[in-house]
Amino acid sequence: MKKITVVGAGGTGHTVAADLRMRGFDVRLCDSEVYRGILDRTAADGGIRITGMMENGFAKIGLITTDTAAALKDSDLVICCTIANRDEEVAEMIAPHLRNDSVVLLSAGSAGSLIYRRVFDRYGLANTLVGETCGNMFSCRLLTERSEVFTGS
């Protein structure tokens, strides 16, 4: 089973993590200490509920953490679902824990792959593949009072 780490505790990160888990992937969800409250609530709820236009259901996420090293251990794919002004911060957060053959995808990219590439090169990760989407993967919103995402078309 492919191991996928989703970085980003907002609506997109929760939606991507839940969607991939419901498709059968081994998913981990992580973010920095700033987002500990959201991650702790999701962990306490046991996972993420999706409602709205996508397949509705509940996704039990294997690991929900602020421990980046644990979240990235043995990952086949890293999907970063954070806002553009966090690109350098997130790249610096994950770089020490990546393999040189890691694959990192940004959603939504906004040319963030250029920033990630620069950071990864400083860490000697020349063979790490970085890609990005041209827009957000999903139209979604995290309902802050519970671990639920509402998805649109």
Indicate residue ranges for each PLM-predicted region:
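NAD(P)+-binding Rossmann beta1-loop-alpha1 motif at the extreme N-terminus of oxidoreductases
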Residues: 1-53
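Rossmann-like NAD(P)(H) cofactor-binding subdomain of soluble oxidoreductases
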Residues: 84-147
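Rossmann-like NAD(P)-binding element
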Residues: 54-105
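Conserved anion/nucleotide-ligand pocket segment
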Residues: 147-153
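A general structural motif
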Residues: 1, 24, 75, 100-101, ...
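Short mixed-charge
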Residues: 46-61, 127
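Alpha-helix N-cap/loop-to-helix initiation residues
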Residues: 13, 35, 71, 87, ...
